[in-house]
């Protein structure tokens, strides 16, 4: 099956955002509503609310100079079970972030159904050191109403962040991170559900660029202070419901978290952005509302 292509480009001209290119084919669906906000919003969806076995989706996005783009979804992206004889469901996203531009990939979590097989690849290329990016990659355990607990066949998510080298066609890699969830019987380490220790939501948040400089410093300082590292993002009733860690690698701040329920994860992320990235419009945090 050939890749289903999609393209999207947004430019900022005299402080006004214009969508200059948008194209998609089934099963991909793109919506860029007109708003009075000082940034552009792109909803990435699929017909039926999910991806079926064998789907292969490829989307290219360009965020022009000085532009701000918030990429969202309308609800969880469902991953349906793999049909015998069909290849893994695949989704590829390539994003270029221009000079002094900001890209926010803050979608709802992916929801893999039982026996699904999914490979996600997300590549981000920053124009220079003035480009900023917030990338959230998170997933759920399955469908709670039928007691699915990490019963997908395989879930793989690959993230790569690069920056262009001035006066050169080359790029330097700032981050490569891969999340793999599958059973490994040969290692005798237990099934996926056993290894996840009842966590229902796990994810990674990556921050880079000058627009998140203060955010990154605040998050890292909070984490270093072990006695107070949870106090500003979770109250005492939530301390046992979520665990998280933070570090910085080649100017990319990485926040990894695991929560016992989705609501706790949403609240954690909402508080984190509200406390440490208050410059973001509340509309950009729609994925954390509940």
UniProtKB/Swiss-Prot annotation:
One of its GO terms (cellular component) is nucleus. The keyword Chaperone applies. This is Uncharacterized urease accessory protein ureD-like. One of its GO terms (biological process) is urea metabolic process. It comes from Schizosaccharomyces pombe (strain 972 / ATCC 24843) (Fission yeast). Probably facilitates nickel incorporation. Keywords: Chaperone, Cytoplasm, Nickel insertion, Nucleus. It is found in: Cytoplasm; Nucleus. InterPro entries: UreD. Belongs to the UreD family. The keyword Iron does not apply. GO terms for molecular function: nickel cation binding. HAMAP family: UreD.
């Amino acid at each position: 099956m050939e890749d289903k292509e999609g393209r999207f480009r947004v430019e900022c001209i005299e402080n006004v955002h214009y969508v200059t290119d948008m194209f998609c084919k089934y099963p991909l669906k793109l919506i860029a509503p007109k708003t009075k906000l000082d940034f552009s919003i792109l909803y990435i969806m699929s017909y039926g609310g999910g991806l079926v076995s064998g789907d292969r989706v490829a989307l290219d996005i360009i965020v022009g100079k000085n532009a701000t783009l918030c990429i969202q979804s309308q609800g969880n992206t469902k991953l349906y079970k793999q049909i015998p004889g069909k290849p893994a469901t695949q989704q590829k996203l390539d994003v270029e972030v221009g000079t002094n531009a900001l890209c926010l990939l803050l979608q709802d979590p992916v929801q893999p159904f039982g026996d699904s097989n999914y490979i996600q690849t997300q590549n981000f290329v920053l124009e220079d050191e003035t480009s900023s990016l917030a990338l959230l990659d998170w997933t759920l355990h399955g469908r709670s109403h039928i007691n699915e607990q990490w019963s997908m066949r395989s879930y793989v998510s690959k993230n790569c962040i690069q920056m262009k080298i001035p006066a050169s066609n080359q790029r330097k890699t700032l981050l490569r991170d891969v999340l793999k969830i599958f059973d490994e019987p040969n290692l005798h380490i237990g099934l996926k559900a056993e290894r996840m220790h009842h966590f229902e939501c796990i994810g990674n948040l990556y921050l880079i660029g000058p627009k998140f400089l203060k955010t990154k410093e605040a998050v890292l300082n909070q984490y270093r202070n072990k006695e107070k590292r949870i106090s500003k993002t979770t109250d005492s009733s939530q301390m046992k419901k979520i665990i998280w860690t933070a570090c910085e690698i080649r100017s990319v701040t990485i926040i990894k978290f695991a929560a016992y329920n989705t609501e706790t994860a949403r609240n954690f992320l909402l508080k984190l952005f509200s406390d440490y990235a208050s410059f973001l419009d509340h509309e950009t945090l729609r994925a954390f509302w509940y």
